Amino acid sequence: MSTYAIIDLGGKQLRVEPGRFYDAHLFSSFKSLLSESNTKIIIFRVLMISHGTEVQFGYPWLKNASVKARILHKKQNDKMLIYKMRSKKKTRKKFGHRQKIARFIVDAIQYNGQTFTTNLK
């Protein structure tokens, strides 16, 4: 039985499962939470939950649904290079940037009082 949820986090939709690591772009509400490691967060923007054969959809979000997670640390993504060139003009520009991201682990998915966690034995 695979349990997963689709959440809306920072303008992106992520498919999350309990016990797995994910990277999310660092946005303003995350920046205040990163002062300490293992900061616990609760995400209420849950679009869909699947548990076994049951699937629940929200319009746009599910009521009484949340995803509990811990922010482990912040880091930077690999460098993205941008190269602009005008043909036949000898004009070239090369620059890049590194996007700041936060790594988090999903502890549990909750829906209507039920808690779905990992089934590690």
Curated annotation (Swiss-Prot):
GO molecular function annotations of the record: rRNA binding; structural constituent of ribosome
Q: Which GO terms describe its biological process?
A: translation
The protein's superkingdom reads: Eukaryota
Keyword field: Chloroplast, Plastid, Ribonucleoprotein, Ribosomal protein, RNA-binding, rRNA-binding
Major localization class: plastid
- Listed Pfam families: Ribosomal_L21p
What is the annotated localization of this protein? Plastid, Chloroplast
Instruction: Cite the InterPro entries for this sequence.
Output: bL21-like, bL21-like_sf, Ribosomal_bL21
Transmembrane intervals: none
Instruction: Give GO cellular component annotations, separated by semicolons.
Output: chloroplast; ribonucleoprotein complex; ribosome
Q: What does this protein do?
A: This protein binds to 23S rRNA.
State the family it belongs to: Belongs to the bacterial ribosomal protein bL21 family.
According to the record's subunit comment, the protein's assembly and interactions are: Part of the 50S ribosomal subunit.
Q: Which NCBIfam families does this UniProt record tie to the protein? A: L21 (TIGR00061)
| The protein, known as | Large ribosomal subunit protein bL21c
Query: Which source organism?
Result: Chaetosphaeridium globosum (Charophycean green alga)
- Annotated gene: rpl21
